[in-house]
């Protein structure tokens, strides 16, 4: 780093340390300075005299580390008994640690380029001068502590949490430079070193704090590489949230759980129309222990304020001294609450009761099968409000009592494993069952249980239904309830408990009623000729009254209890409530799942046979990687053998949690295209059975027709020869003629005589004779009909054998197939220059649609507050703007609590029941997003072999975006097909994408996807339609019955089917964040290449190759570079030549070769032709190669073909040779027959 001059640094002038070690007796020789030499010499002489005249024992040792250690060693063995009796002295205050080199360097640079941002005199963060901009984090509130900078108008960027403005001209010299170069290593900031690794900035935990937002991070040259916004505590280290630069583009790096490091503004609360900081409540009331009721009232007044939890913590922590944090602090809030008794539908033996362990809620959102159970007792807290993991407290009559936690039990069809407990909540892992029971044993050894109907079936993680976590396997994303008792974002509502009736407080004494309070506050009401009611804390006697005419209830406003629908709310306080945090939040984690045994695979002709060995039910799925995926899946429970057909496009098979297996067929066959006719027919029959049968049938018919024609001509000649003898009565045919014409020397019956005989004796044979000409006519017409198809096939094969297209310009355009992993070569011929070969290979192709979020949906939670029971009166509903809110008033209720009737009246009581819906706590992690998908943008990652270098570039395939490969420009796209696997509406759930026509926002249906909708997981706007209907409560019971449709989100999770990852055609791989389809093998991609002149080599500079010959010693077609060609040549000089196949059906692996003198080179090629005839160009010279290729031995391979796959196989030269021989032989026979006929006709005509 360059030295930055400064006048004063830590109140001293900076001087470099001398290079030589300091001697024992230091002789100071001043530097020669002409203007002050005399004065300095006098000062030095005076200083030396003072040192020499001072006594040696009085000289203090020099303050260095070595002398200090020696002095400590000498003083260690001295034992002074007097010193032991001295009282221990207080430790002197430690001096502030001196800043290190990194801190000093940053302070020098920060002195000019950063400014404090203040709010009401407090430093909230910092603003930094970088380049030509003033940058300040947007979340830092306040004004820059500089008159010029405070006047600037800032532009806000919510995406990067940054505000920027132009630096005033006179302050540009103070700004720091920035850089996008960030090699991994250590950087500097105000508090020391910052480590950059894996794309993240981290510091030791504790080195940064709120108030550091806006501080810059420097490299060793003093350039700003990032600006700090906040941090996320990750244990020993803290990951920084920063804004940085990547090639002049601003990017934001935000680790998970990052918090903003702006100094928090004080939050205000309200008490008696007076505001105060929520973290510092006023002294009246200031503490729950001193004034519990007033403190709870103050908390209820501020329950909706942002600083409520600060006020709650301050009110429950009365000691002004700073206390040591521990897990007990998480239980401190429970001293303001109490357990309670509530109605349970089944307390054992099928009867209901008011149970101390009533079940409130059972949550099963965790995908790992863990249940979160809420009960009415409290675990981990004793009756004295102290924390004890081994205890629980429950409500025994009007007062809490302690019991052992060891007596707690949870069971479904079998006992469950309890994994965590705190407060009202239990975590348990349970087997499947239809009911859930919780219970405990109280202090009197009495067992209490409560059973609820609950269908529990542990969900399946992954693709295998296993029962226990394996030791080795695969990590998959899942969710669970974190076993942490720390405060979370989840909360429950609490309120003051209602007055609890207790008939046992009243006794009848000779016409009077005595109320015994037992140290409690009792509210009583008697109707004995007049109204007699009030509150009492002492025993009271009601004269001339009976117990049936009185009502007594215990009132307690010193504690909160859970806002339960099984307990009425306090009639005096109405809707007043508080909130407390609850433990065990739902979080995304990873779960280890097993991997099924690899199947035994046997390859066959266009098929694979898999022998599967499942240890437990395992999912098998497969799809074709062509246009029609034909997806299929099944659960395999026992050993099974499966045979699957492998199409030409390939087959993808997924077995359990293993990675997918991919298979491609090869053109393997038992015959050969270069053998005898029956071997050739067998070869083509196994490859193309239909085509082979048609061609062989037509060829056989043609050959038989030719043979038949020859026979007919011979018969005609024979008839011409024997006719004269037949017409002559008694003529005898000469022996030679009878031998040649195969006739008897006597006269035979004529055709008409034979026909007359058949008509009279055998008519079926007569008609068969007549149908022969008609059948011949039909066969001939069919042959003429099939002749154009054969012509098209031959024309297609002829076109495929034409040489590769070349271009005579440096602007080259080519089209490559959209197939990942298959290299494609193109040849650029430019007049006057040596040919250039460009090799391109698609490494990935991404289709990313433009998405607009309509809403998110998740599981809903039905919120049912405690019912309001209006004794001796009528309650009224009020309108509330809550989702799916419902409110009803039921008359004629007579509710009972455990101590007796809740109300004094019999029939004039009313119950107000209300309920509404809100997003469940699991919506932060378990939700599905509904998107509208628009036009997809395509991008490609391309590997280019250019000028001997392999270079990988990424480009948008839109035909407009240009990328540079060395000195050449490549423009990719647009793609030939605008196809995308995404419909107009898609649903994204975690890492899966589904095409789904979901309902629009505000039109959800009960029990279906979208029954509850919200714009984002954090937004407060919620729409719900769950068919929530309140029902009349049962007589004598305090509860809020209701009817509601089941969660549409959970129903969709069960019935959603396979995602696009498994069902997308063309082998697409679907990914999220962002949503995209990767490597879809559909269509072609045009590429335009602009090659500069300097990239070409002139013909005069390139070697000249002559006397070329080609020999193919081995060739296996339809295999990955299974052909080998040896080319002999003579080169004019040593150099490098481009090698290229001029035939599209043949792909050569090498792009260029070294040539020198008389030598030979070996190239590898791949083709689908059985008889490959192609031309190879080396430099500017071409040579003809011919190969007789044999079929591959492997039926199935796990890689796609590296050559052009033809729809129809070519005809081998051997097959053509056999066709010529057979056709020539038959043709010769026809020619001989024709010659005989001509001679006979000529002779017969000459006689006439």
UniProtKB/Swiss-Prot annotation:
The chain crosses the membrane at residues 693-713, 764-784, 796-816, 1225-1245. This is Structural polyprotein. Residues 60-74, 84-101 have a biased composition (Basic residues). The keyword Chloroplast does not apply. Residues 721-741 are annotated as: Transient transmembrane before p62-6K protein processing. Its EC number is 3.4.21.90. Residues 14-104 are annotated as: Disordered. It is an enzyme of class 3 (hydrolase). Residues 22-44 have a biased composition (Low complexity). The record marks 187, 220 as: Involved in dimerization of the capsid protein. Residues 1-692, 749-763, 817-1224 are extracellular. It comes from the Viruses. Residues 716-720 are annotated as: Interaction with the capsid protein. Residues 262-274 are annotated as: Functions as an uncleaved signal peptide for the precursor of protein E3/E2.
């Amino acid at each position: 780093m360059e030295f930055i001059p400064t006048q004063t640094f830590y109140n001293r002038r900076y001087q470099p340390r001398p290079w030589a070690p300091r001697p024992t007796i230091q002789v100071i020789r001043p530097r020669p300075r002409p203007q002050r030499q005399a004065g300095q010499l006098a000062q030095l002489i005076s200083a030396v005299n003072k040192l020499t005249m001072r006594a040696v024992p009085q000289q203090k040792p020099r303050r260095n580390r070595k002398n200090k250690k020696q002095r400590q060693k000498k003083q260690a063995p001295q034992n002074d008994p007097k010193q032991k009796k001295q009282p221990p002295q207080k430790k002197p205050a430690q001096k502030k640690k001196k800043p290190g080199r990194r801190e000093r360097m940053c302070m020098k640079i920060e002195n000019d380029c950063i400014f404090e941002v203040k709010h009401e005199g407090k430093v909230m963060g910092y603003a930094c001068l970088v380049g030509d901009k003033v940058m300040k984090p947007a979340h830092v509130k306040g004004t820059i502590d500089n008159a010029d900078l405070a006047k600037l108008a800032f532009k806000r960027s919510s995406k990067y949490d940054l505000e920027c403005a132009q630096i005033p001209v006179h302050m540009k010299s103070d700004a720091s430079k920035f850089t996008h170069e960030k090699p991994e290593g250590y950087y500097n900031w105000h508090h020391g070193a910052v480590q950059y690794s894996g794309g993240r900035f981290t510091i030791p935990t504790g080195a940064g704090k709120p108030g550091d937002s806006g501080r810059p991070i420097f490299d060793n040259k003093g350039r700003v590489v990032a600006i700090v916004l906040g941090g996320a505590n990750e244990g020993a280290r803290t990951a920084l949230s920063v804004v940085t630069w990547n090639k002049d583009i601003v990017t934001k790096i935000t680790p998970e759980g990052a918090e903003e490091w702006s100094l928090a503004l004080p939050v205000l609360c309200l008490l008696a129309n007076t505001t105060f900081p929520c973290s510092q409540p006023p002294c009246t009331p200031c503490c729950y222990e001193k004034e519990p009721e007033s403190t709870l009232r103050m908390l209820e007044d501020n329950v909706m304020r942002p600083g409520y939890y600060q006020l709650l913590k301050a009110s429950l922590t009365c000691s002004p001294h700073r206390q040591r944090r521990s897990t007990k602090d998480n239980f401190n809030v429970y001293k303001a609450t109490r357990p309670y008794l509530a109605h349970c539908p089944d307390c054992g033996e099928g009867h209901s009761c008011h149970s101390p362990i009533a079940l409130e809620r059972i949550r099963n959102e965790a995908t790992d099968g863990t249940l979160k159970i809420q009960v009415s007792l409290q675990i981990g807290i004793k009756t004295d409000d102290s924390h004890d993991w081994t205890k629980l407290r429950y409500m025994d009559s009007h007062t809490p009592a302690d019991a052992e936690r060891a007596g707690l039990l949870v069971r479904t069809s079998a006992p469950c494993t309890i994994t965590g407990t705190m407060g009202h909540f239990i975590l348990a892992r349970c087997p499947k069952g239809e009911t859930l029971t919780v219970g405990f044993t109280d202090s009197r050894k009495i067992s209490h249980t409560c059973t609820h109907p609950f269908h529990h079936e542990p969900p399946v993680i992954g693709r295998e239904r296993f029962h226990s976590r394996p030791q080795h396997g695969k990590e998959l994303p899942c969710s669970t309830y974190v076993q942490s008792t720390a405060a979370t974002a989840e909360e429950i509502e609490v309120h003051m408990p209602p007055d609890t009736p207790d008939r046992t407080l009243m006794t009848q004494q000779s016409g009077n009623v005595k109320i015994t309070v037992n140290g409690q506050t009792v509210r009583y009401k008697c109707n004995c000729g007049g109204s007699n009611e009030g509150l009492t804390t002492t025993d009271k006697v009601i004269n001339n009254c009976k117990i049936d005419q009185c009502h007594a209830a215990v009132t307690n406003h010193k504690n909160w209890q859970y806002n339960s629908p099984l307990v009425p709310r306090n009639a005096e306080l109405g809707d007043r409530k508080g909130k407390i945090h609850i433990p065990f939040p739902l979080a995304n984690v990873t779960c280890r799942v097993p991997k099924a045994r690899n199947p035994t695979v046997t390859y066959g002709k266009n098929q694979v046979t898999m022998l599967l060995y499942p240890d437990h039910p395992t999912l098998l799925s497969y799809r074709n990687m062509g246009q029609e995926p034909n997806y299929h899946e099944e659960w395999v429970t026992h050993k099974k053998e499966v045979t699957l057909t492998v199409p030409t496009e390939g087959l993808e098979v997924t077995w359990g949690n293993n990675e997918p297996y991919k298979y491609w067929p090869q053109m393997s066959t038992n015959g050969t295209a270069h053998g005898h006719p029956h071997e050739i027919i067998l070869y083509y029959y196994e490859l193309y059975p239909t085509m082979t049968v048609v061609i062989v049938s037509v060829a056989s018919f043609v050959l038989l027709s030719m043979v038949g024609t020859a026979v007919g001509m011979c018969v005609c000649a024979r008839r011409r020869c024997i006719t004269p003898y037949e017409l002559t009565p008694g003529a005898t045919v000469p022996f030679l003629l009878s031998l040649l014409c195969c006739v008897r020397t006597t006269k035979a019956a004529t055709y008409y005589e034979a026909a007359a005989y058949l008509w009279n004796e055998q008519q079926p044979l007569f008609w068969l004779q007549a149908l022969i000409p008609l059948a011949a006519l039909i066969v001939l017409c069919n042959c003429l009909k099939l002749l154009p198809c054969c012509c098209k096939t031959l024309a297609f094969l002829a076109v495929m054998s034409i040489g590769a297209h070349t271009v005579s310009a440096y602007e080259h355009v080519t089209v490559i197939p959209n197939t990942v992993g298959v290299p494609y070569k193109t040849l650029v011929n430019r007049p006057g220059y040596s040919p250039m070969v460009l090799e391109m290979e698609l490494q990935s192709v991404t289709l990313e649609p433009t998405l607009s979020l309509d809403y998110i949906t998740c599981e809903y939670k039905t919120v049912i507050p405690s019912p309001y029971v209006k004794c001796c009166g009528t309650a009224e509903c009020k309108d509330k703007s809550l989702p799916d809110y419902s409110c009803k008033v039921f008359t004629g209720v007579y509710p009972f609590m455990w101590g007796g009737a809740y109300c004094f009246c019999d029939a004039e009581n009313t119950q107000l029941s209300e309920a509404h819906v809100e997003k469940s706590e699991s919506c932060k992690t378990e939700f599905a997003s509904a998107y509208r998908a628009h036009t997809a943008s395509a991008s490609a990652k391309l590997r280019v072999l250019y000028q001997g270098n392999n270079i990988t570039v990424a480009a948008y395939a839109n035909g407009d975006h240009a990328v540079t490969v060395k000195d050449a420009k490549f423009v990719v796209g647009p793609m030939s097909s605008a196809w995308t696997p995404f419909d107009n509406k898609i649903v994204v759930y975690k890492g899966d994408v589904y095409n789904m026509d979901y309902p629009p926002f505000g039109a959800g249906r009960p029990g279906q996807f979208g029954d509850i909708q919200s714009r984002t997981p954090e937004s407060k706007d919620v729409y719900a339609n769950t068919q929530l209907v309140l029902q009349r409560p049962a007589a004598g019971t305090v509860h809020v019955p209701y009817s509601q449709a089941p969660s549409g989100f959970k129903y969709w999770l069960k019935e959603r089917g396979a995602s696009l990852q498994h069902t997308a055609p063309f082998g697409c791989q679907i990914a999220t964040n962002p949503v995209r389809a990767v490597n879809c093998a559909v269509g072609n991609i045009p590429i335009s290449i602009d090659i500069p002149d300097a990239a070409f080599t002139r013909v005069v500079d390139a070697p000249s190759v002559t006397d070329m010959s080609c020999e193919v010693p081995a060739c296996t077609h339809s295999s990955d570079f299974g052909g080998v060609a040896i080319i002999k040549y003579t080169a004019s000089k040593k150099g490098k030549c481009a090698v290229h196949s001029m035939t599209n059906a043949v792909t050569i692996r090498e792009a260029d070769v070294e040539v020198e003198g008389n030598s030979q080179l070996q190239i590898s090629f791949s083709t689908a032709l059985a008889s490959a005839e192609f031309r190879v160009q080396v430099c500017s010279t071409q040579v003809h190669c011919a190969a007789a290729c044999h079929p591959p031995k492997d039926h199935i391979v796990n890689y796609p073909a590296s050559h052009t796959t033809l729809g129809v196989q070519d005809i081998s030269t051997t097959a053509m040779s056999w066709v010529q021989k057979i056709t020539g032989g038959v043709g010769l026979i026809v020619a001989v027959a024709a010659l005989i006929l001509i001679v006979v006709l000529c002779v017969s005509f000459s006689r006439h």
